Amino acid sequence: MEITLDSPLDMHLHLRDGDMLRLVAPLSADFAGAVIMPNLVPPVTGAAALQAYSERIDTAMGGIPFTRLMTLFFKSYSAAELESARALPEFFGIKLYPAGITTNSEGGLADMAAAAPTLHLMEDMGIPLLVHGESHGFVMDREAEFLPIYRRLAQRFPKLRICMEHITTTAALHLLEEHENLCATVTLQHLLITLDDVVGGSMQPHLFCKPIAKREEDRAALLRAALSGHPRLMFGSDSAPHPQHKKECCGCAAGVFTAPLALPRLAALFAEHGAADKLQDFVSGNACRLYHLHPVPRRITLRDTPMRIPAAYRSYGQRVVPMHAGETLSWSIVPTAAG
């Protein structure tokens, strides 16, 4: 069996910087493009920094055509600052992190009320808002506690396109139905695992991420929604590489590295459930329609032949362990013929 995808997009990707960027950028290029997260150190907070980071990504891709949908880290922006960013062809939107909620988010928003002036400007200019929607409460309840904020944002800014990133709960799916200006991304890991897979037996640090994996009923609901072809649900890997020594330690970093295997694993999942025809919209069609995107043309063919995942990816002094490390997947990408 084969599945052919046109210009798949990853609507939530971490590429990091420096040597880590040089390692993971080509490994993320099975997709035709991606929304790139801005939580570097220091974060990407202006047009010049955004353009410079985009150019570093382009260099790291080594000539692979790749649509870079770049984001700014949310802060108070003036109209002039937003216009400068909007003038860049690679600018996509602004990512809001509650302060301290995830990797390199210490400079995130501490007072949601203070966001209103910038959000009004974004609404007027048609700039999408992307949100890591978690509170600082009990870890299993953080997304649920943030949902009322999503609701208020959707009501107060009805023309603002708001993306609830990496949703993990049935409750978030219910909220998605309430407001047409809400959309959402879902990760591979949250379609596959629950908290029990992370900590139910031996601790599995390479499955630990934020938002944390939830209960089986949540995973099943997310999968049903993805398989159904929901028009405002998109794939966003949240592929988040960390050096192996920062994952296999006390106080390990949060993040699952899935970029090199995401498309074959999704193909297997959708085919297994008789929904191969829904995969195109999940990994590209919905995003292109919602955001009027035109990624570089790329045709990817996947086939139900085995693919071995390495124990780690290493180069430039970096070593990153992926999800499914050392395992054999049932689907793989068909190599493109040279010439």
Indicate where each model-derived feature is located.
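Active-site microenvironment of metallo-dependent hydrolases
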Residues: 1, 267-339
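Divalent metal-dependent hydrolysis catalytic cores, especially in the metallo-beta-lactamase
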Residues: 9-11, 23-49, 63-75, 91-104, ...
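Active-site-proximal loop/turn and secondary-structure-junction residues that shape catalytic pockets
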Residues: 15-17, 40-42, 74-76, 98-100, ...
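Short, acidic/polar
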Residues: 18-25, 77-88
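Short, electropositive alpha-helical surface patch
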Residues: 68, 142-159, 177-188, 241-260, ...
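Histidine/acidic residue-rich metal-binding segments in metalloenzymes
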Residues: 80-96, 104-235
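His/Asp/Glu-enriched, well-ordered alpha-helical/loop segment
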Residues: 228-295
